[in-house]
């Protein structure tokens, strides 16, 4: 059985969601897990991964990987953190309304409408994830943002300054090279103060 499949079956079998698997040249096997998404969960009611969850998955993975003869020198199981990757439609559904960073596979090109201030060669965006109309039968999404100029520390913002206009870019998952939650520290929302992480040498 392939390593990806082995780890995913083990993680989901314990009631968690596999977010990401990373292997380094130094022999580190890093497994990122999260609580499964339940549609309709009220804001603020979502559960988070803690150290006990990571330890539970670590123990089971150690046993399974030894049986499978997987080669690694160190196993690390952790929660996604504040810059969680978004890969599936379920991830986008789960984090609709959140601030995200996306990188397109190709520049927006003609998607930059006439009069837009967005460069046609732009590929990276940060904004709020929203649902949009389906495209060719596929779920549609859009990112909404405003290109406000950066404010320097101590700089006063004039009350007369006109806010930058909101802009939106529609896309499907097929057009995304990478997407992550924007690493914004908000202890009252998405993530608890401590990020669970368990690392054990083989």
From Swiss-Prot:
Keywords: Cytoplasm, Ribosome biogenesis
GO terms for cellular component: cytosol
Keyword Cytoplasm attributed: yes
One Pfam family of this chain: RimP_N
Compartments where found: Cytoplasm
Stretch forming the signal peptide: none
Entry similarity comment: Belongs to the RimP family.
Entries under NCBIfam families matching the protein: PRK00092.2-1 (NF000929), PRK14642.1 (NF011235)
Primary role: Required for maturation of 30S ribosomal subunits.
UniProt protein name: Ribosome maturation factor RimP
Gene (name only): rimP
